[in-house]
Amino acid sequence: MKNIKTSPYIPTDISIQEIGKNKIKISAYPFESGYAITLAHPLRRLLLGSSVGFAPTALKIEGAAHEFDSVRGIMEDVALFIVNLKSIRFKMRGDAERVTLDYSFKGPATIKGSDLVNDYVDVVTPNQHLATINEDATLTFSLIVQKGIGYVPSEETRNLIPEGYIPLDAYFTPVKKATYEIENVLVEDNPTYEKIVLEIETDGLIEPIAAFKDALGVMQKQMSVFNSEWSVSSAESTSSDEEDPELKPLLQKIEALNLSARSFNCLDRAGMKFVGELVLLGENELKEVKNLGKKSFDEIKDKLEEIGYPVGSDLAEEVSSALQKRLNKLK
């Protein structure tokens, strides 16, 4: 007879194997059925999204006005230059989180990642091609390199860069690849246990095992909120908005306004049930309610003024937000 477990199995085995340059395979097992995917998927997301790296976020090239331009004497147009630049992986020296780098190269020359090394940055992809300069030509450009995590599209930094610079999509993460597989393993004649096989590859900025440990650290910190001291709110406290004296008249049913049958029916057909819904409407929006005539509009306007909330009242942001939440729950 199979024994009934009283607690989940605790994994006991882990192996780490180097399978290439800046590339490792981590195997951990045995996990209860379903547990492996529960852990492997967020670990992969954290590896790709939380690892700290450095990337160019803006570029200015002398003689180029935009990313679809070209520069005389440079074989690559600006678009291809940017593609090549994104493949160059930077590492900032010191504790700075943002630096502006200025470069100028005279042709004929072939510019690679190693040519961008200076007192402020190192390059972990020194052989990556950047540009080819013809004879009698000069390539002058400036870069803004920043520290960050994950991926940040250029739209999010467009308003943060100096005038004249081209914003760039920033790939900060030093993790090039993070994949996992879930395999079954046999434990005490039970084949339903699982193994996580995780492969991690970095660009050389950090070791894969360091990236893995960083991801574990982030996961533990994210989970720590659930391990802090907390208390359970009573049901009464969760409905405290109803007791707010400023919200109370706004949460009344429209019937409380004692409108004429014509005005009430018009609002009812429009799906309006509470006084607060009318107060949140602007004057023009109320006038646009289907079949609401001028006489009914004037009546509603007068009734709302009587309770101290004229049509289009300028409610405080926190009151408006709390009212909207309560109305959504009540409807």
UniProtKB/Swiss-Prot annotation:
Region called Alpha C-terminal domain (alpha-CTD), residue ranges: 247-331
Main EC class the enzyme belongs to: transferase
Keyword Amino-acid biosynthesis: no
A biological process from GO: DNA-templated transcription
SMART domains: RPOLD
E.C. number(s) listed in UniProt: 2.7.7.6
GO cellular component, one term: DNA-directed RNA polymerase complex
Pfam families per UniProt: RNA_pol_A_bac (PF01000), RNA_pol_A_CTD (PF03118), RNA_pol_L (PF01193)
Subunit relationships: Homodimer. The RNAP catalytic core consists of 2 alpha, 1 beta/beta' and 1 omega subunit. When a sigma factor is associated with the core the holoenzyme is formed, which can initiate transcription.
NCBIfam families: PRK05182.2-3, PRK05182.2-5, rpoA
Name by which UniProt lists this protein: DNA-directed RNA polymerase subunit alpha
